[in-house]
Amino acid sequence: MLDTLLINIGQLLTMDQEDGLLRREAMNTLPVIENGAVGIENGVITFVGTVEEAKGLQAKEVIDCGGKMVSPGLVDPHTHLVFGGSRENEIALKLQGVPYLEILEKGGGILSTVNATKQASKEELVQKAKFHLDRMLSFGVTTVEAKSGYGLDDETEWKQLEATAQLQKEHPIDLVSTFLGAHAVPKEYKGRSKEFLQWMLDLLPEMKEKQLAEFVDIFCETGVFSVEESKDFLLKAKELGFDVKIHADEIDPLGGAEAAAEIGAASADHLVGASDKGIEMLANSNTVATLLPGTTFYLNKESFARGRKMIDEGVAVALATDFNPGSCPTENIQLIMSIAMLKLKMTPEEVWNAVTVNSSYAINRGEVAGKIRVGRKADLVLWDAYNYAYVPYHYGVSHVNTVWKNGNIAYTRGEQSWSTATI
């Protein structure tokens, strides 16, 4: 007997088409079951089909979804989850057009967050991050990548990674940990970036042994780390058994996209300034282009990543919030979906695939997250919407009704609007 059976699902977005990364037309295709049903047993999906096909199934609880839509839990593959403080005091500077790198040079930007994170205890960081994770869950997210990077020293980086490990045990959202020690060059290492990178590399063997990080990331940008420094750093991390990511071409077209494809990074993120050659190389690789349009929007920039061109050229595109205290302080992945549709010229179908299937592959979770398929974890979202286009169309609010994580209700908005029923 099933534990739970969801019936009368108006649109069941299984996202279950071809295995692997979605490109071109596959990104613009959504497998939808009309009048669908999903069965759950011991936290795992055991039935996917129509209500007609579900007749005869028995369950301890049958939930009538009332014609509303159900999707997989969403995947946010790029966040800076664990940090201290906030940076609302920088809004005025940004409105005046002060460049981020100039704010950074004055001790603001990431350096402000670094100081706040250093001063916070691990428990304070955990409690703050739980608040943000609860919000992410309320927007339908069930899997999140979480970066360190607000320490720029060994003690604080360890503290962030240990906080993430504790959150993995204490919060229902699945977390994927990334070490971003190479997020900026500390003042004391100004002009000695290679020495700083070696210090960060020296931390990796113990980090691997303690399983505190799965990925290693670096901020490849003018005034931070060069393309060659980034490639060398990430290749050494790969030799130690880590998968790698890269903050690439966010501000200047340095060739970060090309570097990511060349070294086989799991993802290249931002890519606002990615060159035509970089896009071509990404299209011919298994590196996911994780686009972060919320950051461009919040920084009030005119030029967004060329998402339309990337998809047309065959790049596997994912979307993420880039949740962080400085350049994108939002947990709302649904807002990111809307911005991507309007500013990156992505279709609703492409947007949905970019926050489920491709985003799961960007963090090596393509075989366990992002699809509704028999045998996978029952990470499901019931939406207060009757078709998938409505969610990115009606922007600025959350359309989530209920979230199931591993078959258990992890979030519901007020009183549940669905009703129990028999089949």
From Swiss-Prot:
CDD domains: Imidazolone-5PH. GO terms for biological process: L-histidine catabolic process to glutamate and formamide; L-histidine catabolic process to glutamate and formate. GO terms for cellular component: cytoplasm. The keyword Iron applies. N-formimidoyl-L-glutamate binds at Y150, N324, G326. One of its GO terms (molecular function) is imidazolonepropionase activity. InterPro entries: Amidohydro-rel, HutI, Metal-dep_hydrolase_composite, Metal_Hydrolase. Fe(3+) binds at H78, H80, H247, D322. The keyword Zinc applies. It is found in: Cytoplasm. 4-imidazolone-5-propanoate binds at R87, Y150, H183, E250, S327. Coiled coil: none annotated. It comes from the Bacteria. Binds 1 zinc or iron ion per subunit. It catalyses: 4-imidazolone-5-propanoate + H2O = N-formimidoyl-L-glutamate. Its cofactor is Zn(2+); Fe(3+). Keywords: Cytoplasm, Histidine metabolism, Hydrolase, Iron, Metal-binding, Zinc. Catalyzes the hydrolytic cleavage of the carbon-nitrogen bond in imidazolone-5-propanoate to yield N-formimidoyl-L-glutamate. It is the third step in the universal histidine degradation pathway. Belongs to the metallo-dependent hydrolases superfamily. HutI family. This is Imidazolonepropionase.
